[in-house]
Curated annotation (Swiss-Prot):
Organism: Blochmanniella floridana
Biological process according to GO: translation
Gene this protein is translated from: rpsU
Cellular component, GO, one term: ribosome
InterPro entries, A to Z: Ribosomal_bS21, Ribosomal_bS21_CS, Ribosomal_bS21_sf
GO molecular function: structural constituent of ribosome
PANTHER family: MITOCHONDRIAL 28S RIBOSOMAL PROTEIN S21 (PTHR21109), SMALL RIBOSOMAL SUBUNIT PROTEIN BS21 (PTHR21109:SF22)
Name the record gives this protein: Small ribosomal subunit protein bS21
Amino acid sequence: MPIIKVRENEPFDVALRRFKRSCEKAGILSEVRRREFYEKPTTERKRAKASAIKRHIKKINREQLKKSRSF
């Protein structure tokens, strides 16, 4: 849980913005969304594998694009 100490004479808006930024960096909102509903372990593994395949394909496409551009 991110903790923010409000500085002296610091406006509330600025402190709230710092808190939101620290929550974003800690990944709290994405974690809450991910845990909102139960996901079976098999479904979780399937989703993780699909995202890994997608990342791999994107990496290959980027490398091919670099090779075709550099001449």
